[in-house]
């Protein structure tokens, strides 16, 4: 496997200093002088982001912030929260007009409070024109009406992670391509004492990704194109019945998993398949004691369900600035700075495939071809459906995701708390309150 010099930089303990001192700072100073966004006098920014899963991604990110500060004089203070803690903290900040200047969260977060997001249409237009245009999912997540309320910084591909040896033991040479094949594979791995598992707790990334995929794969939907709730359908029942069978062949305990649990149990050798980003593989490669796992795992696309087409749901990471910030120009400058090629290419390599680009110009970044096990993640931003499904991505769809309406519906059936019809009724009632 080829290791690229820039990746070596960001994985070292001196990553921040190395990147900032290797030409990045001089470029950043020139950029700051030419950029249309001039930070306000005395500007300082606070940013709340999700807790990283790949150390070298965060190293590269902090290196870029360091260069931005030295070039503009704007200090950026970063705090980190788990996926599930960001929506409530951002909502409180929006309601009280107090908190971090910027939030870097998940999926449709800005659409929980679109009127509290700084209009960043100028930044989005600048980046889109310069870097080959935005992928469709980024436009959907970025815009509210005719204006951009956030910058979709990246997408984390949520793919199937699996152990190659367990796949072969189950009698297969490639990962299942259909939901029927996937169920048989789950049964076989359980029989072989190499079960898999997918989160069914309030895991903002992993749990939502697989239950939305499952619902859509069977033709079910939360709402129609007019945002009318249509959850109560035979297709939803089929999706729940299928999920129950999958669950019965998973490792026990997934109903309490958050976004970190499957990483831990996969790396501990307790499961042989799960849905996740590239962070499990990245951690295994980084840890000399997990080399055997890194060599014995790979990634696959989600199986296609009865509707006959992909229904993947990957994790978008939008960045927004709150309207209460005293420094909107500094906030815009930071967003634009991060996605400039001289910065973003290094960051992508530092993320070792965990982050996927939403701008077409970055298709040729070497991270996608340096390791064949990374390549599948390159298309995540282009393949993903968006949180609204058939409907719009707005406050209602964002609230349904944040409230785990579909996750709880699936969990109620899988754990036996409710039968499918009763679980659908509960979820339908919750969704109707949001969409009225």
Give a label for each model feature.
Residues 37-39, 108-111, 125, 279-294, ...:
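C-terminal lobe and pocket-closing loops
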Residues 145-153, 158, 183-229, 235, ...:
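Extracytoplasmic/periplasmic solute-binding protein
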Residues 37-39, 75-76, 168, 383-436:
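Conserved C-terminal helix/tail region of periplasmic/extracytoplasmic solute-binding proteins
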Residues 33-39, 106-159, 183, 210, ...:
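Hinge/lid segment of periplasmic solute-binding proteins
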Residues 185-188, 226-255, 298:
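Glycine-centered hinge/linker elements that transmit conformational signals in sensory
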Residues 2, 8-31:
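N-terminal export signals
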